[in-house]
Amino acid sequence: MILQAAGLGLGAAGTGIMMPESVNAAAADFNDISKWPGSTDEAQSSFEQATSYNNFYELGTDKGDPVKNADKLVTEPWTVEVGGECEKGGKYALEDILKPHAFEERVYRLRCVEAWSMVIPWVGFPLADLLKRFEPNSKAKYVEFKTILDPANLPGQKFPVLQWPYSEGLRIDEAMHPLTLMAVGLYGKELPGQSGAPLRLVVPWKYGFKSIKSIVSINFVEKEPKTSWNVSAPREYGFYSNVNPEVSHPRWSQAKERRLDSKSSGFSALFSEKRETEMFNGYADEVAGLYAGLDLRENF
């Protein structure tokens, strides 16, 4: 669907790895996409690790639920509603969102708030390039995003685990930062359902839950928007949620993490020795200036 919407050709889909049918549903490959020069050269997580160990509560709360229930996420047709403090709001079909943009592969570290991490090659384009098309005005201080609301099909939304629809937000300067990615694929393939098809954020210096999946709404707002995890547990999940080894979660330390990558077999890394977590997930040189003068303990 993504490739058709973007007007790109389809390639052969073989991975050489036997996967559950729902993982293989990613299907089409991206051809001839550029490689971003800033990608990390750290050992990547495997496709299986990245698509079978997921947090996507709309599809279930266990790590294996999203891949099992990925076919419950209906992605055709797909539209994104854009509104708030901008000149060109409206309801946009997926193809209208994607067609002007050139995709590239970026290999980013992903740090979960649960103290595990991965390294994933994403396919996408800078979020800033999309947001500028909507011409936000001077009152647009934040950008609010919402995930699809479809309790008839999505098993997790039948229960009040979180405030539905899932909502996230960024300051406008965070959203416009060159590292912030609108992703449409991973490992050279379209995003599967469990990874947030067809459109998700990747904000590599923040904990993973800030990288909202299956986006259907983008809203430019003047005041800090409410976010689902912060509403659910404000002492545990702040608005910023920058990766910070010096600020512990109330129930565990954030100083170290366990890395799931190709050096480990399957998910054995979850029981391996932990590694030190880097400030801003290793992207401090690029993003620390966004928070100059801000108390990162208070604004966690």
Predicted segments with their positions:
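Structured, non-membrane catalytic/scaffold regions adjacent to prosthetic-group chemistry
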Residues: A26-F300
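N-terminal export signals
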Residues: M1-S22
